[in-house]
Curated annotation (Swiss-Prot):
Location of the protein in the cell: Endoplasmic reticulum membrane
Pfam families assigned to the protein according to its UniProt record, in alphabetical order: UBX
Tissue/organ expression: Expressed abundantly in ovary and testis, and weakly in all other tissues tested.
Protein name: UBX domain-containing protein 8
Species whose genome carries this gene: Homo sapiens
Length: 270
């Protein structure tokens, strides 16, 4: 349509100019010749209009697919951006769930293990157990120890002398709590590591020399809050009570390598 308008304007502006030129160049031209010339001009303009129209349509036929393809590409690009955005949101949500459900518990467990190892290396493994801390304040800890001892004695049906706490003059002091020998270094010769699995589920570890008296195991039990009258030791595999006799060393009772011992409550007796 635009091309036809251009042709029309060109024709209207060209007719007067052609007439003037003809009158100047051929002053004696007749009306018949003038009409014939105008017919030829009109025919030429018609042919020119037809050529322009066909050419424009032909060019538009090549141009329209390109525009269509460009629009399709823009739509596809927008669609891909939307899909990528959704994928990124889904991946971010998965990463958050992974951090919350897997990574964070794993880090907390790792920190707990490092804390347990630190306390075991510094000889403060009693902080990890749920036993009684002996040798504390004589006012409150004495009363709590007496109460727990009586309750344990009632549940275990122990003889009467064990249910009564000694008089103040006969009460054991902190000095009577068994002392453990100094823990040898890990690189020392004849050293073994004993892991003690408590009823609470905690596992305590300590190093001893094979030449130490086997009584040191019971002293260790008492020191972390498990009295030998209420608890016993047994081997993990095969499961059997640990036989300890006076004068025997750890090597004599079979503890020659790193060993796991089970600390369990004694059975009730009627």
């Amino acid at each position: 349509m635009a091309s036809r308008g251009v042709v029309g304007i060109f024709f209207l502006s060209a007719v007067p100019l052609v007439c003037l030129e003809l009158r100047r160049g051929i002053p004696d031209i007749g009306i018949k010749d003038f009409l014939l010339l105008c017919g030829r001009i009109l025919l030429l303009l018609a042919l020119l209009t037809l050529i322009i129209s066909v050419t424009t349509s032909w060019l538009n036929s090549f141009k329209s697919p390109q525009v269509y393809l460009k629009e399709e590409e823009e739509k596809n690009e927008k669609r891909q951006k939307l899909v990528r955005k959704k994928q990124q949101e889904a991946q971010g949500e998965k990463a958050s769930r992974y951090i919350e459900n897997v990574l964070k518990p794993h880090q907390e467990m790792k920190l707990r293990k490092l804390e347990e190892r630190f306390y075991q290396m510094t000889g403060e493994a009693w902080k990890l157990s749920s036993g009684h801390k002996l040798g504390g304040d004589e006012g409150t800890s004495q009363t709590s120890f007496e109460t727990s001892n009586r309750e344990a004695a009632k549940s275990q049906n122990l003889p009467k002398p064990l249910t009564e706490f000694p008089s103040p003059a006969e009460q054991p002091t902190c000095k009577e709590i068994p002392d453990l020998p100094e823990e040898p270094s890990q690189t020392a010769e004849e050293v073994v590591t004993v892991a003690l699995r408590c009823p609470s589920g905690n596992v305590l570890r300590r190093r001893f020399l094979k030449s130490y008296s086997s009584q040191v195991l019971f002293d260790w039990m008492t020191r972390i809050g498990y009295h030998i009258s209420l608890y016993s030791l047994s081997t993990s595999f095969p499961r059997r009570p640990l036989a300890v006799e006076g004068g025997q060393s750890l090597e004599d009772i079979g503890i020659t390598v790193d060993t796991v011992l089970i600390l369990e409550e004694k059975e009730q007796t009627n």
